[in-house]
């Protein structure tokens, strides 16, 4: 895979995070993986979360391992389900060393494939921080199941709580006004519990849709029964500290433009668009004033 592209170096007090549902080996997956690796080379992320990562012995090398090798990164992978002679799961990649890592199985129905949350301790230049990724049930009528799943995801985050901000990324298969996402955003109660995470996109673009499942992406048509133009992929950050750690400074879509091959074929990196967010990790003097806040809901 080529290492091309350029992007401004991340601000010295920030870390840059990216999430993408990789869509396994669907479509021209080898060309898509090239596109993913090239784009990542250009945006210089510190940590990447991938969902629908495939590994099939004898035919598909672990896709996260291929991307990590192309970038010289570290990575961890956890399978969530087995099918087609191989495994599918989640991965976390980073230019920093990855220490302890584990996963937890999420509640899921018999008709659904396995669901997990993968957690990894990333040893950054600012110290250790825990990063989590997940991929929730995809059927639109499974909102109740996704509610159960986000409750467990929050339990996992709380179990790994330390002094640094934590980030939860992935394909939540739920829109911002769903109860499961509103709960994560601190706007409703589930099972008598409350939580609050910053929705990175909403913190920066409260009035923009940020669709990651878009009618502009022709790969989406393979799952034509799922409504298009929805924001399903998120980067959530634990609350901003008084010293400004955890402040979201940037959020934008990624992998939302196609590459045109020699024969005129347009390929996207995936059937989903990705999300990029930049989060502050270096402390500032609290006397500098309170961090910026969003006036938006979830």
Q: What positions do the PLM features span?
A:
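Short, solvent-exposed loop/turn elements at domain surfaces
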Residues: 25-29, 102, 208-212
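Active-site beta-strand/loop signature of hydrolases that rely on acidic residues for catalysis
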Residues: 15-22, 36-60, 93, 120, ...
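N-terminal membrane-anchoring alpha-helices
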Residues: 1-10, 27-30, 34-41, 289-291, ...
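Alpha-helical scaffold elements lining the catalytic groove of polysaccharide deacetylases
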Residues: 142-155
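Glycine-rich, phosphate-binding/catalytic loops in enzymes
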Residues: 34-36, 64-68, 110, 148-150, ...
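Metal-dependent phosphoester-hydrolase catalytic domains
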Residues: 1-5, 158-166, 174-298
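Active-site environment of divalent metal-dependent phosphoester hydrolases
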Residues: 25-27, 55-59, 83-85, 139-141, ...
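Structured beta-strand-rich core segments of catalytic domains in phosphoester-bond hydrolases
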Residues: 2-12, 29, 47, 51-136, ...
């Amino acid at each position: 895979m080529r290492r091309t592209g350029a992007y401004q170096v991340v601000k010295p007090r920030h870390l840059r995070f990216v999430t993408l549902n990789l869509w396994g080996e669907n479509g021209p997956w080898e060309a898509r993986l090239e596109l993913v690796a090239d784009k990542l080379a250009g945006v210089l992320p510190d940590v990447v979360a991938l969902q629908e990562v495939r590994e099939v012995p004898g035919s598909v090398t672990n896709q996260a391992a291929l991307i990590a090798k192309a970038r010289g990164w570290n990575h961890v992978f956890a399978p969530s389900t087995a099918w087609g002679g191989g495994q599918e799961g989640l991965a976390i990649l980073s230019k920093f060393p990855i220490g302890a890592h584990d996963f937890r199985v999420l509640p899921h129905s018999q008709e659904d494939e396995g669901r997990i949350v993968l957690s990894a301790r990333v040893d950054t230049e600012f110290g250790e921080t825990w990063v989590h990724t997940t991929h929730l049930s995809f059927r639109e009528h499974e909102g109740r199941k996704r509610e159960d799943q986000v409750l467990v995801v929050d339990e996992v985050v709380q179990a790994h709580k330390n002094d640094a901000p934590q980030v939860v990324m992935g394909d939540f298969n739920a829109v911002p006004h769903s109860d499961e996402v509103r709960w994560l955003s601190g706007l409703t109660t589930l099972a008598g519990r409350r939580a609050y995470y910053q929705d990175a996109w909403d913190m920066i673009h409260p009035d923009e849709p940020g669709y990651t499942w878009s009618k502009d992406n022709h790969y989406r048509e393979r799952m034509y029964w799922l409504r298009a133009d929805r924001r399903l992929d998120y980067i959530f950050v634990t609350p901003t500290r008084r010293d400004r750690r955890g402040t979201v400074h940037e959020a934008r879509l990624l992998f939302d433009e196609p590459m045109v091959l020699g024969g005129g074929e347009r390929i996207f990196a995936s059937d989903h668009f990705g999300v990029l967010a930049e989060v502050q990790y270096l402390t500032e003097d609290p006397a500098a004033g309170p961090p910026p806040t969003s006036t938006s809901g979830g």
